[in-house]
Amino acid sequence: MTDNELIGMESNAIHEDVLARVREKMPDEDPVYEVSELFKVFGDSTRARIICALDIEEMCVCDLAVLLNMTQSAISHQLRILKTSRLVKSRKQGKVVYYSLDDAHIGDIFAKAFEHVMEEREG
């Protein structure tokens, strides 16, 4: 959009005071982009199911594969994506690697999402 088009749009604004307040409080584009990328990771149902399981208890790939009726390879692939996105962390105990949520915020985000979904179903 050209500067002239932007100026024209601003002159069409009805509520300048609202625009000013919102502009002042709007986050910068970079964190908004990062949040949208986070939601893309959440957007896969397999990853969402893994997050739900790990919100209950840490688990190894083998147990996650059995729980979700998937191959270990498929689970490992999804865990790699979750780990790269800093949603999941791992710890090794002997030969077994256990996965858990990276922090409580991840579970909180899902709890709010489930609250929203259940609210829509009930109302």
Question: PLM features: what roles do these ranges have?
Answer:
Residues 1-42:
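N-terminal leader segment of winged-helix/HTH proteins
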Residues 43, 75-78, 113:
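Generic structural signal for conserved hydrophobic packing positions in ordered secondary structure
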Residues 58-59, 83, 114:
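Residue-level detector of secondary-structure transition/capping positions
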Residues 66, 77, 83-84:
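Alpha-helical residues within the helix-turn-helix
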Residues 83-93, 100:
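Beta-hairpin "wing" of winged helix-turn-helix
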Residues 100-123:
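Conserved segment of winged-helix/HTH DNA-binding domains
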